[in-house]
A protein has these predicted regions:
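Short, well-structured segments within or immediately adjacent to enzyme catalytic domains
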Residues: 2-267
Length: 267
């Protein structure tokens, strides 16, 4: 997937990586763009946008399926069987609907979601639907910028493909010392400076920026890890993959704050 994201970024405006999927194009957060195709995977996904990468960059959807996944089945796709039942879905046949069956991809830089680098005052009790869990203020601020409904996960498509700019619900939610949560893009590591008085020592390299990871969750739809003992294979922006063991107060992404966020948002 690393080379797929790099290829996409090389041809996209501003060298951006693909946005998060959110809703499939026939569904929407408030009103369905196409009411002729209903009740088929009509919920948002925490994976890369299928319409952005398939089939031009991602030629085989099985790349998105982890052999060790604890979820039943693989990536979901609109099929001829669905079109036979509902002809309005014919134009979407072959499109990916649920690219997050094994891995999660957010499309934004998350750099403030580990108790190693934030304080207890930077943690928020986020409620989504009937669930309430602790997430970092940065994740909560991004959530409120993206969702169309405050207490439910209904991401707006336009928000998923843009930088999230302050003011935020919670202060200091931007990446580094900025007032922006950046979309993933080539060169974005330049904005990750945490100490303006010593930028050379406090910036991040692409090898430290999270792109994609195995699903993990403390609750909700995904209570199991893909790999036992608990941990995740993590893809970083420079293309390397590393296995990270789960630690509640560990590094991003294999920690309690990220696991809580995925538990709240994954379906």
């Amino acid at each position: 997937m690393g080379i797929i994201y790099k290829m996409y970024a090389g041809e996209s405006p501003s060298n951006k990586f693909p946005p998060m999927q959110g809703y499939p194009i026939w569904d929407g957060p408030v009103i369905d763009p196409d009411p002729t195709c209903n009740k088929h995977y009509d919920y948002p996904a925490l994976g890369p946008s299928g319409i952005a990468i398939y089939p031009e960059y991602l030629t085989d959807i099985n790349v998105l399926n982890c052999p060790s996944s604890a979820r039943q089945g693989g990536v979901k796709m609109m099929t001829p069987e669905i079109s036979a039942q509902e002809p309005g879905c014919l134009q979407y046949e072959g499109m990916i609907a649920q690219p997050d069956m094994s891995y999660f991809y957010l499309g934004f830089i998350v750099d403030k979601a580990s108790m190693k680098t934030i304080s207890p005052s930077d943690v928020f009790q986020l409620t989504v639907g009937s669930k309430t869990l602790e997430v970092s203020n940065q994740v909560a601020s991004a959530y409120f910028k993206i969702t169309a409904v405050g207490d439910d996960w209904k991401p707006k498509p336009e928000a998923l493909d843009s930088d999230l700019k302050g003011p935020f619900a919670y202060p200091n939610s931007g990446n580094g010392t900025s007032d922006t949560i950046y979309r993933l893009r080539e060169g974005v590591e330049r904005f990750m400076i945490t100490d303006i008085n010593n930028p050379a020592a406090s910036n991040k390299a692409q090898s430290e920026i999270l792109i994609m990871s195995d699903l993990l969750s403390n609750t909700g739809a995904d209570q199991l890890f893909n790999h036992i003992p608990g941990g995740c294979n993590v893809l970083f922006m420079d293309g390397h993959v590393a296995f990270q063991k789960y630690e509640a107060q560990g590094d991003i992404p294999c920690n309690a704050l990220i696991a809580n966020a995925i538990g709240l948002l994954a379906q």
